[in-house]
Each structure stands twice: as structure tokens, then as C-alpha cells.
Amino acid sequence: MADEIAKAQVARPGGDTIFGKIIRKEIPAKIIFEDDQCLAFHDISPQAPTHFLVIPKKHISQISAAEDADESLLGHLMIVGKKCAADLGLKKGYRMVVNEGSDGGQSVYHVHLHVLGGRQMNWPPG
């Protein structure tokens, strides 16, 4: 977890990201779901027994940069996350998280929804 915080402290918006490369299939990912709006794939550094990301194909650097026109797309990410969680057998529950900015732990500046499950989540999360 400390590595992710360190990455977030130096990450900055702008330019291409690893997620853009995954969307364009330039680098491999364990894809769970894909449609014309988004892509869901397993996290390469899982923080729970099940940990996947749902990302929009449209580049939005962070939630604070989202526009009103992105409302439907952002809602779609949550619905896809819910469906993928069900497909992966997360019957007892799961957590959805979006990190915003360096203090929020955002290490990749392309909006992404984390879905974590397969164990009891702790509270508070931070």
C-alpha cells in the first residue's frame, strides 16, 4: 500500500497513461468485460482476493475534471462494476472506490473505479 501512496504523490495529470495502452490493446490485461464505453480488468496489484478496475474508454483524467455530459458514462462504470462483481461471485459484498488527486491516492490519471471483494473490508478505509 505504501508503494501506491508514493506513486500517487508523484503522479500528475496529462499525457498517455497505462490505461490508454490497455484500452488500445498495446499491453496485456486480464479483461473481464468490454463494451463501447468501458473496460473492466483485474488489478495488477490486488489489494483483496478479488480486485478489478472499471475504466471509461473516453479519457477523463480525474473525477474533478468530469463534465456534466459524462454523468451517464460515470454511472455506467458503476453498473458494469456491479455486474462484474456478480459474475465473479462476490455475493457477500464488495467495495467500490474512486481515488481523486494525490491526497486521495490517485496514481493513474485516467478515472478508474476499483472494485474489491472476497474478504471483509475494514472501516475506516483510509
Swiss-Prot record:
The record places the active site at: H112
**EC number per UniProt:** 3.9.1.-, 3.4.22.-
Q: Which SUPFAM superfamilies does this UniProt record tie to the protein?
A: HIT-like
Query: Reaction catalysed by this chain?
Result: adenosine 5'-phosphoramidate + H2O = AMP + NH4(+)
According to its UniProt entry, one GO biological process term is: proteolysis
Subcellular location(s) of the protein: Cytoplasm; Nucleus
Q: Which residues carry this modification: N6-acetyllysine?
A: K21, K30
- The parts of the chain that form a coiled coil are none
An example molecular function term from Gene Ontology annotations: nucleotide binding
Return the motif ranges for Histidine triad motif. 110-114
- Where along the chain is AMP bound? D43, I44, N99, G105, Q106, S107, H112, L113, H114
The entry's stated outcome for H114D is: Nearly abolishes its ability to convert adenosine 5'-O-phosphorothioate into 5'-O-monophosphate
Q: Which GO terms describe its cellular component?
A: cytoplasm; histone deacetylase complex; nucleus
Entry-annotated residues carrying Phosphoserine = S45, S72
Q: What is this protein called?
A: Adenosine 5'-monophosphoramidase HINT1
Q: Which gene encodes it?
A: HINT1
